[in-house]
Amino acid sequence: MKKLYSIVGMWIVSAFCLLSAQSRVYSSVENVHSHNDYLQNVPFYTAYSARCASIEADVFLVDGELYVAHKENEINKARKLRNLYLNPIREQFEMNGGSGYPNGKSFQLLIDLKTDYKETMKVLEQQLLEYRDCFDVKKNPLAVRVVVSGFLPSPEEFSNYADFIFFDGRPRFIYTPEQSLRIPMMSTSFRTLTQWNGLGRMVETDYNMVKAFID
């Protein structure tokens, strides 16, 4: 079943939908997406305690390390992807006996690359491989699914990366059946579909465009 994520703490600027080919068991809390989660007073744990279905971290590669920040000039060397997300996820995963959330539910970690993918993906893949048990949904459907967004490799390059790493799709591409297996969600600018500002009702033509994209 396709679902549209709600975006927490900001205007909706992107439309996210889950493809039916990649059905998962998610939290029952309205499938909320924690956008720019690292800006929370307590990153990861605030969204985790609310049982968000998707948690987002923007990532920069600097001197061979991955840092979580909104802008490059906001990078804090203490705020590494490993510290803020990978280690806490592993801790909770092990406490839950091999599940993202207790009671047989899970979530996705959306990693938005803010630096060129060629070098950033190398380091990201190396780090994720250290936590493979937590993220390999092919071996364990209750593991945490990793989806990479932002500066993405081309669809032809998807197969160069570990098969438990997924990618955020773009409607401008026509994916092969094999590439589509790596695409659990699609994103586009909300403004490409409608100019609705959130006030009043969306006009019917815009509503139909948004609905068609989700469907």
Model region roles, listed by residue range:
Residues A21-D215:
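Phosphate-group recognition and catalysis centered on beta-loop-alpha active-site segments
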Residues M1-S27:
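Bacterial Sec-dependent N-terminal signal peptides
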